[in-house]
């Protein structure tokens, strides 16, 4: 027996809520994946604030209707789709999906959408190569620490240089 209209509305509402909180969406062809493999993918995605949802394309169309930033997904809504919705560390989530696909050899990424722009396979791979949020924060912190160290050394050098000049001048004056 099919779903009731009320249950379909609830599903669409849940998807809308997920989309409202997501930065990126990937569309995967999940044909051939077992329940265990889907559970594995979902657990990998949880670590980077990603969610994998399997829903009918018509329900996803209803959820993206009227949402300008997500309407690009419409062109990917054919066949058997799983939707990976990412709200946190986009790079880590894409890496998790790609690692999963490499291990299982059963699913492929049809495409993705990031900030309203439809992404090609190459662009999705490029996102996966980006460093994680933690690594970027570490690099920024290191750069800021380097700048403050150089400023401190520079400020300290002015009086030291002045003292050396005065000492040299006084030695030259005595001779």
Curated annotation (Swiss-Prot):
What does this protein do, in the record's words?
Forms part of the ribosomal stalk, playing a central role in the interaction of the ribosome with GTP-bound translation factors.
Note the subunit structure: Part of the ribosomal stalk of the 50S ribosomal subunit. The N-terminus interacts with L11 and the large rRNA to form the base of the stalk. The C-terminus forms an elongated spine to which L12 dimers bind in a sequential fashion forming a multimeric L10(L12)X complex.
GO-annotated cellular components: large ribosomal subunit
Keywords (alphabetical) are:
Ribonucleoprotein, Ribosomal protein, RNA-binding, rRNA-binding
Q: Name one GO biological process term.
A: translation
Family label = Belongs to the universal ribosomal protein uL10 family.
Q: Name one GO molecular function term.
A: structural constituent of ribosome
**Protein name per UniProt:** Large ribosomal subunit protein uL10
Record has RNA-binding as a keyword: yes
Question: Can you tell which superkingdom this protein's organism belongs to?
Answer: Bacteria
What gene, per UniProt, encodes this protein? rplJ
